[in-house]
């Protein structure tokens, strides 16, 4: 295991955030401007639209924009008609053109207006589009240089989506601050006491950390050869992994990359997950979770997919309880007019400490 306190010479008492940081509206607005609008801004994966004509609306934006694959590649277009500002496409599918259902205004797959019925002179308008960066198929529209940020990432090859397909997307709303989500995600101290299923699937005794200026990575091993499932849900997941791999142990139990402030890319046996946080207020966070599997599994192994999804969501609900308890306690302290912070457990909470240090640096806080 690595020790971040030694590696970065951080002083724990100076990096923890006061309880007010999780509820302050003015600070929240500053976070949106400094961290999110100037961050990497992940919008989706190219596997969402594998074929020409494929489209996939952005769930996090109430379908206000859409990923479209045209003959030139993948583009991010506005999904709002230039006539009466109606949402045009819903969900995912394939189309030759983008047609507004209200008045049949029609755009090509590059967003150019092709036709506006009953207009003597066609309006000179088009759908707005955004420039995209591509890293391992992940698409970003932000101002950061994503390739530079992740250039030294040691697990990049493990996060290779070649041969994978998008299976489904979960939208999960959380009743707590986005920073609390990241804190829970970046500490392994709670895995054994609070996650009976996950705690018997992965081994935090094998925890290793990797840190970059804008990211951290946790890698954990497989627990006891998957011989002792902790819950009935995880029993099915253990069985699915062992069956698909013919009894051979996977390389890892899990790999969890956090690209600050809000993008998480996760490796599990024969699974890749992209999870993105979208703050909706100091006490509300939307998590959009994309599940990718090898093509063979998506097409022929539904039991594997359902077992993994159920295990993932079981742990997700448990994490919700942790985060809700943390923010409830912080709110109680805030109302009492005080603030308290505790020490970091190293190495299991090194990631949380790294996040706090990053936050203070970028926010100048």
Curated annotation (Swiss-Prot):
Disruption phenotype: Deletion of the gene abolishes the production of 2-hydroxyputrescine. Depletion of 2-hydroxyputrescine has no discernible effect on growth of the deletion mutant. It comes from the Bacteria. Residues 44-141 form the Rieske domain. Binds 1 [2Fe-2S] cluster per subunit. One of its GO terms (molecular function) is 2 iron, 2 sulfur cluster binding. This is Putrescine 2-hydroxylase. Its EC number is 1.14.-.-. SUPFAM superfamilies: Bet v1-like, ISP domain. Rieske-type iron sulfur protein that can catalyze in vitro the 2-hydroxylation of putrescine, forming 2-hydroxyputrescine. May be involved in the biosynthesis of the cyclic hydroxamate siderophore alcaligin. Keywords: 2Fe-2S, Iron, Iron-sulfur, Metal-binding, Monooxygenase, Oxidoreductase. It comes from Ralstonia nicotianae (strain ATCC BAA-1114 / GMI1000). Belongs to the bacterial ring-hydroxylating dioxygenase alpha subunit family. It is an enzyme of class 1 (oxidoreductase).
């Amino acid at each position: 295991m690595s020790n971040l306190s030694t590696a970065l010479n951080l002083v724990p008492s100076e990096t923890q955030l006061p309880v007010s940081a999780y509820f302050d509206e003015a600070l929240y607005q500053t976070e949106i401007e400094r961290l999110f609008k100037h961050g990497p801004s992940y919008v989706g994966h190219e596997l969402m639209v594998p074929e020409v004509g494929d489209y996939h609306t952005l769930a996090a934006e109430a379908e206000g924009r859409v990923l479209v694959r045209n003959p030139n590649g993948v583009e991010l277009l506005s999904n709002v008609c230039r006539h009466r500002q109606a949402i045009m496409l819903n969900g995912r599918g394939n189309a030759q053109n983008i047609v507004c259902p209200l008045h049949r205004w029609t755009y090509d797959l590059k967003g150019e207006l092709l036709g506006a019925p009953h207009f003597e002179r066609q309006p000179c308008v088009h759908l707005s589009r955004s420039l995209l960066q591509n890293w391992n198929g992940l698409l970003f529209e932000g101002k950061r240089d994503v390739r530079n940020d992740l250039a030294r990432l040691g697990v990049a090859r493990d996060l290779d989506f070649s041969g994978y397909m998008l299976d489904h997307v979960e939208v999960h709303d959380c009743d707590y601050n986005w920073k609390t989500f990241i804190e829970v995600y970046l500490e392994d101290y709670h895995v054994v006491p609070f996650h009976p299923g996950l705690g018997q699937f992965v081994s935090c005794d094998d925890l290793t950390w990797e840190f970059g200026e804008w990211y951290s990575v946790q890698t954990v091993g497989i627990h006891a050869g998957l011989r002792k499932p902790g819950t009935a849900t995880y029993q099915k997941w253990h069985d699915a992994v062992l069956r698909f791999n013919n009894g051979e142990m996977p390389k890892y139990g899990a790999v969890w990359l956090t690209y600050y402030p809000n993008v998480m890319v996760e490796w599990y046996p024969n699974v890749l997950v992209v999870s993105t946080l979208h703050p909706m207020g100091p006490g509300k966070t939307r998590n959009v979770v994309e599940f990718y599997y090898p093509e063979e599994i998506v097409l022929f192994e539904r039991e594997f997919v359902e077992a993994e999804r159920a295990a993932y969501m079981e742990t997700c609900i448990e994490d919700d309880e942790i985060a809700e308890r943390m923010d409830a306690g912080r709110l109680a302290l805030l109302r009492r007019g005080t603030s308290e912070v505790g020490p970091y457990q190293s190495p299991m909470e090194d990631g949380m400490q790294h996040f706090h240090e990053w936050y203070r640096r970028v926010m100048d806080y």
